[in-house]
A protein has these predicted regions:
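Hydrophobic transmembrane alpha-helices that form the pore/transport pathway of multi-pass ion
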Residues: 107-194, 198, 360-401
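Hydrophobic transmembrane alpha-helices of multi-pass solute/ion transporters
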Residues: 2-80, 89-109, 231-233, 245-321, ...
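Generic alpha-helical transmembrane segments of integral inner-membrane proteins
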Residues: 18-22, 26, 44, 48, ...
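Transmembrane-helix bundle segments that line or gate the permeation/cavity pathway
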Residues: 157, 162-170, 199-216, 447, ...
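Alpha-helical transmembrane segments of multi-pass membrane proteins, especially transporters
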Residues: 38-46, 66, 70, 74, ...
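Membrane-embedded alpha-helical segments and adjacent helix-loop junctions characteristic
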Residues: 55-144, 296-383
Length: 469
């Protein structure tokens, strides 16, 4: 009787999971609905099915609020970025960066340099979101001035930002992954090099190849017009570069994110008053609706008409709807049911490792947050890895390869939503040009199949001893 109940639970878990995926595909690809509406409808339908199958609504509601709470910092950072962009354009900070950046960086080298710069900053600060929200924003303007399509720029910046987020000992994910897996941070970082460095090198090579196509992308007339227009409409004082320098310095000192961005917004407003003669009404407009450029030069107006709190609301709505989408799947225990079934059906350490990658990816699709994945998947698989004699540094690497990295290429994932909002392009547009985000998983499966770079596999209870380099 118990076996039949387990089989019934497994079939229901599979049906709920497949149903949610089908809704996403139909909504986004065929109905062409917005991401928010698709997630909201998906959450409503799967909630109804879960309740009919015995999940209590109170549990779904509690899970929903837990999801929103976990997303809280991401929501506020997204809103803060809108305020920063509006104030930094009004202050002349971003126009100044564009002005000097266009003269100092060749279009052919821009993507390569942008990736390296973001790598350095993220390694030093340990934050990918902070890197994108400061240095990334500045590089966006430069890329537009150089005529480089935004999907390429987004890919290069994300790869650079994520590189440090995965490997910096200051990164919260680098600290959390080994803590949730039962290993130490040094072993974790060293082990991640095997899946991170190859993807990073391939990404840099891709940016050199793509960059070679843009050696003459901006005509001298267009470049001159952009520089001339910026010089006529803004006071391009080098001192206007202080706001991002202040923010970066505070991030390096590991100050809390929200106060740091508040200082950045305040600095932008003060510099707008001092250097651009902005009025309080202009500040309020830039912070609320975004900076509205009216130079009469279309390419410049397109570059600078950005930011503002209102412009972040669509991104915030996607985050909230993602919480709705994941709540019934998490509350109904879909993941635990699938993991238990996987463990019962396998006898191989290779299958266990591969299953952990698949399970964590599924859970990331459900919850949209790598923080949730770390705190749930790590403890679930830690005893399983121990039983099969698998070094737990493989578990921590798995959490980073899937959660930290793949979250950038999931349209409703927290990182993907954030990046899409900052860059103004969809996740599907830039995913191909951020290969390090998904190549880590590819290399991980190669290592699992070949037994390379997984450490020494101790004998499981039912298996003979195996050793792998």
């Amino acid at each position: 009787m118990k076996e039949k109940k387990n089989e019934s639970s497994l079939s229901k878990a599979i049906i709920l999971l497949v149903l949610s995926i089908v809704i996403i595909i139909i909504g986004l690809k065929f109905v062409k609905a917005s991401t928010s509406i698709t997630l909201l409808v998906g959450g409503a339908i799967t909630s109804a099915v879960a309740v009919l199958w015995g999940t209590k609504w109170d549990e779904i509601e509690k899970t929903l609020f837990d999801n929103v709470r976990l997303m809280g910092i991401g929501i506020f950072i997204t809103m803060a970025i809108g305020l920063i962009v509006g104030s930094w354009i009004l202050s002349g900070t971003i126009p100044t960066i564009i002005y000097y950046g266009m003269q100092m960086i060749a279009p052919s080298a821009f993507l390569f340099i942008a990736c390296l710069l973001c790598s350095i900053m993220s390694l030093a600060t340990g934050t990918s979101w902070g890197t994108i929200g400061t240095l990334g924003i500045a590089l966006i303007g430069v890329s537009q001035g150089l005529g480089i399509p935004m999907q390429y720029t987004a890919g290069a910046i994300i790869v650079g930002a994520m590189f440090g987020d995965k490997l910096s000992p200051l990164s919260d994910t680098t600290i959390m992954a080994p803590a949730m897996s039962g290993t130490d941070i040094i072993s974790h970082i060293k082990h991640m090099l095997y899946t991170t460095i190859p993807g990073y090198i391939i990404s840099l090579g891709l940016y050199l190849v793509i960059g070679s196509r843009f050696s003459g992308s901006v005509s001298s007339e267009t470049s001159t017009l952009i520089l001339k227009t910026l010089g006529e409409h803004f006071n391009l004082n080098p001192l206007t570069l202080l706001p991002p320098i202040i923010v970066i310095a505070l991030i390096v000192k590991k100050m809390p994110s929200i106060p740091v961005y508040a200082v950045g917004v305040l600095a932008g407003c003060v510099f707008a008053l001092i250097f651009q003669g902005a009025t309080l009404s202009q500040m309020a407009a830039a912070l609320g609706s975004g900076f509205a450029s009216d130079t009469g030069v279309e390419i410049v107006d397109t570059m600078l008409s950005r930011g503002g709190l209102n412009g972040t609301m669509s991104t915030v709505s996607i985050m909230l709807c993602a919480a709705v989408f994941g709540a019934p799947l998490k509350a109904s225990g879909v993941l635990h049911t699938l993991v238990n079934a996987l463990e019962r059906s396998t006898k191989s350490w290779k299958t266990i490792m591969a299953s952990s990658y698949i399970a964590n990816t599924i859970f990331l699709l459900i919850t949209t947050s790598y923080y949730v994945c770390f705190t749930v998947i790590g403890p679930i698989f830690q005893p399983i890895y121990e039983r099969y004699g698998i070094p737990k540094k493989n578990l921590s690497r798995m959490l980073e390869d899937t959660s930290t990295a793949l979250c950038w290429v999931i349209p409703w994932g927290m990182s993907g939503i954030y990046a899409s909002g900052v860059f103004g392009v969809s996740v599907m547009d830039y995913a191909l040009y951020a290969p390090m985000t998904w190549l880590g998983v590819v290399f991980a499966f190669i290592y699992i199949a070949t037994g390379r770079f997984v450490g020494k596999i101790e004998p499981a209870k039912s298996e003979p001893e195996q050793t792998h380099a």
